[in-house]
């Protein structure tokens, strides 16, 4: 019997290594186009996404208009079509074991569905059961609990039958609102001890490596 019938996985920096190699470099380009002369470090970018979420960071810190938000999104979509991130070692085994045991794998992410399905096809060899990505209206994206409520409704699951696996605080906010347990994907935040410390204290579980998650789910 599975410990959690449904895994709810983040995508960026949980399944694939995309922040430093794809998302941050593109945002530097966009910032130079929209706000010439303004700079952002990788650490500032990470902390902005962690504490406020990407969209709010763009609006509050850089004053992006709604048109600029839309232009950024369209540019990002075009950029990531030719930039495919690598998966974290071991995450494929977690996903395949969950499915082999009859479980569900859903994705709740700020990536768009097209890129998630592409990455799963390229690296995982199967597709998630459901995806709640950036394509959804903003009020239905994490940290709003809408994705979790929809998953529970669709599959007839209770909160304790889901496990969110994510590296960022908005996921904790989402899960906490509906009493769904969450595991910190520490393998995506090894260079950020302050984030690791806070998420470890907030989340129900914390794992430094995908192997630790695998052992917890299937071997313990």
Task: State the predicted function of each range.
Residues 2-93, 101, 114-115:
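N-terminal helical cap/lid subdomain that shapes the substrate entry/recognition surface
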Residues 73, 94-122, 132:
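Substrate-recognition element of Asp-dependent hydrolases with the DxDx(T/V) motif
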Residues 31, 35, 63, 99-102, ...:
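Glycine-centered loop/turn motif at secondary-structure junctions
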Residues 90-94, 147-150:
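Well-ordered alpha-helical segments embedded in enzymatic catalytic cores
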Residues 1-5, 113, 118-220:
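Asp-based, Mg2+/Mn2+-dependent phosphohydrolase catalytic module
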């Amino acid at each position: 019997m599975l410990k959690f019938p449904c895994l709810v996985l983040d995508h960026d920096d949980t399944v694939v290594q995309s922040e430093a190699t794809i998302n941050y470099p593109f945002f530097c380009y966009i910032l130079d186009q929209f706000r010439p002369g303004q700079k952002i470090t990788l650490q500032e970018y990470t902390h902005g996404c962690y504490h406020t979420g990407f969209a709010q960071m763009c609006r509050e810190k850089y004053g992006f208009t709604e048109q600029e938000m839309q232009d950024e999104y369209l540019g990002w979509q075009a950029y990531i079509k030719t930039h495919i991130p690598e998966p974290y070692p071991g995450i494929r085994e977690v996903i395949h074991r969950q499915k082999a045991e009859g479980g569900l794998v859903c994705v709740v992410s700020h990536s768009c569905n097209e890129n998630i399905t592409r990455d799963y096809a390229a690296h995982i060899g199967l597709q998630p059961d459901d995806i709640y990505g950036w394509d959804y209206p903003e009020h239905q994206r994490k940290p709003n609990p809408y994705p979790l409520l929809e998953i529970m409704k669709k599959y007839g699951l209770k909160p304790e039958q889901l496990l969110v696996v994510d590296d960022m605080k908005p996921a904790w906010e989402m899960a906490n609102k509906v009493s769904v347990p969450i595991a910190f994907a520490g393998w995506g935040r090894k260079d950020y001890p302050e984030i690791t410390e806070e998420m470890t204290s907030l989340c129900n579980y914390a794992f430094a490596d995908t192997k630790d998650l695998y052992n917890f789910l299937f071997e313990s």
